[in-house]
Swiss-Prot record:
Domain of life: Bacteria
Protein name (database record): Chromosomal replication initiator protein DnaA
Record flagged with keyword Nucleotide-binding: yes
Gene that specifies this protein: dnaA
Protein purpose: Plays an essential role in the initiation and regulation of chromosomal replication. ATP-DnaA binds to the origin of replication (oriC) to initiate formation of the DNA replication initiation complex once per cell cycle. Binds the DnaA box (a 9 base pair repeat at the origin) and separates the double-stranded (ds)DNA. Forms a right-handed helical filament on oriC DNA; dsDNA binds to the exterior of the filament while single-stranded (ss)DNA is stabiized in the filament's interior.
């Protein structure tokens, strides 16, 4: 029994490293170990849909992990229905108690799990297919690091900040819906997440869900494939607050726009708060239904513009303080003067300064700053290209030529470190040079899953900030793609 638990813990630890926080929470946080008989490990799932999805998405990877860890003969079985539980000689009473214990463990780890879940289990004598554990929607997606307290206010974002704070204090009252629009890296997501976190603090009974437009789309498509559209509609139309990030990603996608239209109406009629973010005004959205655009303009539309010099200085100072580095005033002003794009680039500049200090053990001077600024400006210029300007085949040609690989390498399943690294880079470049979704990118790279592509993109993004060699390689590849 104990060995089985240990093996399951190894599997969870390995998968956690490969998935985003929200994906791991969605698929693995509410699974629990039941028993281990011989070489079979039994894992209980909260409902049949969850069981089917975990098997479909992760069975192959779990088997690979078992082989890697030296447990090739072990089999992991996911169970749900009462009949299955009885087949495994597990009394329904025991399962109910284990479910309660598991639920209490989850509540200890995460205070925001719906207390309703515990009531459901405590008030039932058996764990059956109809008695699902309902976990509060909001929690996996809200990141506690985003708060109103650490949002730096300036003339470019003060109105958006004040509106967001007002919404969190009085959701569904004044500004419903609210749409915050502006360029990349200006703080839209920070404000959106801050609304969720503050509302959660002030209105503990609220069902709050933050979701990106891409994940909203992916979940909708998946619900169609699995005939679970009713579950999807119920999830999104019974919220107290919907926070939908990057709605511009839904352009040219009529099906999901139709679903969002009906979700909007359902929430609006019930006076439930909705906040959206976009990289442009609703009127500028392309291939977006007029009736949906008109819904966005019913409430408050507020923009965030690029930070002015004073705000840029404040942002750099705060980031430097968080990273534990001292930036001389002349260097600080130089970065603020040269990097005028957005907050993300300002913070990236400080991160790169820290990398130079930590990895090369040198003092910051204007030469280093100039080099870093050139890298950031080159990266921004690279990302101004549209999918029409950058051909997907050009990206592939550069990757194959510069990294000395073949089509089979880049689209196959080789585990060789250099090939795996190349696939990560390929996914990252496709994401940055095109408007392809992670699902579409996965198809290009040999049928990889959404979670695999997301892992690749996030890995390269993190590596660029802490590994100068990787960062220089990416910049070099980007330059060659532009020239190709």
């Amino acid at each position: 029994m104990q060995e089985g638990k240990n093996i399951w813990s190894l599997i969870l630890a390995a998968i956690r490293k490969e998935l985003s926080e929200e994906e791991f929470y969605i698929w693995f946080e509410n699974l629990y170990f039941i028993d281990a008989i011989g070489e079979n490990i039994k894992i209980a799932t909260p409902n049949s849909f969850h069981k089917n999805q975990v098997e479909k998405r992760f069975s192959k990877r779990i088997k690979e992990i078992l082989i890697e860890k030296g447990h090739s003969t072990i089999n992991v079985e996911f169970i749900h229905s009462q009949n299955e539980l009885k087949d495994h000689n597990t009394e329904s009473k025991d399962i109910s108690l284990k479910a309660i214990t598991h639920q209490q463990d989850l509540q200890t780890k995460n205070k925001d799990i719906k207390t309703h879940a515990k009531n459901i289990i405590n008030n039932t004598k058996q764990y059956s297919i109809k008695e699902e554990i309902h976990i509060k929607y909001r929690n996996p997606f809200l990141k506690k690091k985003y708060t109103f307290e650490n949002f730096i206010i300036g003339t470019n974002n003060k109105l958006a900040y004040n509106a967001s704070l007002s919404i969190a204090k009085n959701p569904g009252k004044k500004y419903n819906p609210c749409l915050i629009y502006g360029g990349v890296g200006l703080g839209k997501t920070h404000l959106l997440q801050s609304i969720g976190n503050k509302t959660e603090e002030l209105h503990k009974e609220f069902k709050i869900l933050y979701v990106t437009a891409e994940n909203f789309l992916n979940e909708f498509v998946e619900s169609i494939k699995t005939n679970e559209t009713k579950r999807f509609k119920k999830k999104y139309r019974h919220l107290d607050m919907l926070l939908l990030d990057d709605i511009h990603d839904l352009q040219k996608k009529e099906g999901i726009q139709e679903e969002l239209f009906h979700t909007f109406n359902a929430l609006y009629e019930d006076n439930k708060q909705m906040v959206f973010t976009c990289d442009r005004q609703p009127s500028e959205l392309v291939n977006f239904t007029d009736r949906l655009k008109s819904r966005f303009t019913r409430g408050l539309n507020v923009d965030i513009s690029k930070p002015n010099f004073e705000l840029r200085v404040a942002i750099i100072e705060k980031k430097a303080e968080e990273d534990g580095i001292k930036v001389p005033k002349n260097i600080l002003n130089l970065v603020a003067k040269k990097v005028t794009t957005n907050i993300r680039d300002l913070e990236a500049a400080v991160t790169k300064l820290k990398a130079h200090i930590d990895l090369e053990d040198i003092e910051i001077d204007t030469n280093i700053v100039d080099k870093i600024i050139k890298e950031i400006i080159a990266y921004e210029n690279d990302n101004t290209n549209t999918p029409n300007k950058i051909n997907i085949e050009n990206i592939k040609k550069v990757i194959l030529r510069e990294l000395k690989l073949t089509n089979k390498d880049i689209e196959g399943n080789s585990k060789k470190p250099e090939i795996t690294k190349a696939r990560h880079i390929y996914a990252y470049l496709l994401r940055n040079f095109t408007e392809l979704s992670t699902i579409e990118i996965g198809k290009i790279i040999g049928g990889k899953t959404h979670s695999t592509v997301l892992y690749s993109i996030n890995k390269i993004d993190k590596d660029r900030n802490k590994n100068l060699e990787i960062n220089n390689l990416i910049i070099e590849l980007m330059n060659k793609i532009n020239k190709n």
